[in-house]
């Protein structure tokens, strides 16, 4: 059994929508990033990579490489999960916490869970996504960006 933790943050800027959890969420601004800026999937990638002792997303998909410019984070997540399977592990469960004052995530949570479960080749009840605010405190509370944390449990593949 292995546990991994991931964290990511991106600042708002430019045109919307926000891509998060593999889902397009309408908002007047997008997130500034080298890829599509999906903080949820980036945190999840880091959690998975941490659990298999393979560093972080920046090591595998560096923002200094134009190959990853505008990259679809779902493709990155699938690539990371391929590495997890190559190491002999499978997902036990994943828990993702989005920290954002805006946009409201509730209408999109189920679609996020569906996308993540599909990309991680697992049952829907092995994936949880939730959103919270920081009670108007800090950069997320001032609507300057979005943060996300993810925790995964990996089990030996059968």
Curated annotation (Swiss-Prot):
4-CDP-2-C-methyl-D-erythritol 2-phosphate binds at residues 8-10, 34-35, 56-58, 61-65, 100-106, 132-135, 139, 142. One of its GO terms (biological process) is isopentenyl diphosphate biosynthetic process, methylerythritol 4-phosphate pathway. The record marks 34, 133 as: Transition state stabilizer. It catalyses: 4-CDP-2-C-methyl-D-erythritol 2-phosphate = 2-C-methyl-D-erythritol 2,4-cyclic diphosphate + CMP. PROSITE patterns: ISPF. The keyword tRNA-binding does not apply. CDD domains: MECDP_synthase (cd00554). It comes from the Bacteria. SUPFAM superfamilies: IpsF-like. Binds 1 divalent metal cation per subunit. InterPro entries: MECDP_synthase (IPR003526), MECDP_synthase_CS (IPR020555), MECDP_synthase_sf (IPR036571). Pfam families: YgbB (PF02542). One of its GO terms (molecular function) is metal ion binding. Belongs to the IspF family. HAMAP family: IspF. This is 2-C-methyl-D-erythritol 2,4-cyclodiphosphate synthase. It comes from Aliivibrio fischeri (strain ATCC 700601 / ES114) (Vibrio fischeri).
């Amino acid at each position: 059994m292995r546990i991994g933790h991931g964290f990511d943050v991106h600042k708002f800027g430019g045109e919307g929508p926000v891509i998060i959890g593999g889902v397009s969420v309408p908002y007047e601004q997008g997130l500034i990033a080298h890829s599509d800026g999906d903080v949820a999937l980036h945190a999840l990638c880091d959690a998975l990579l941490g659990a298999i002792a393979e560093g972080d997303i920046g090591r595998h998909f560096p923002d200094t490489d134009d190959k990853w410019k505008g990259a679809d984070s779902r493709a990155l997540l699938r690539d990371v999960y391929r590495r997890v399977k190559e190491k002999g592990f499978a997902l036990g469960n994943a828990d993702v916490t989005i920290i954002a004052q805006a946009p409201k995530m509730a209408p999109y949570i189920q679609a996020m869970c569906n996308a993540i479960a599909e990309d991680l080749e697992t049952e829907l009840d092995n994936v949880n996504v939730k959103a919270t605010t920081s009670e108007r405190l800090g950069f997320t509370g001032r609507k300057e960006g979005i943060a996300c944390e993810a925790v995964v449990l990996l089990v030996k593949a059968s």
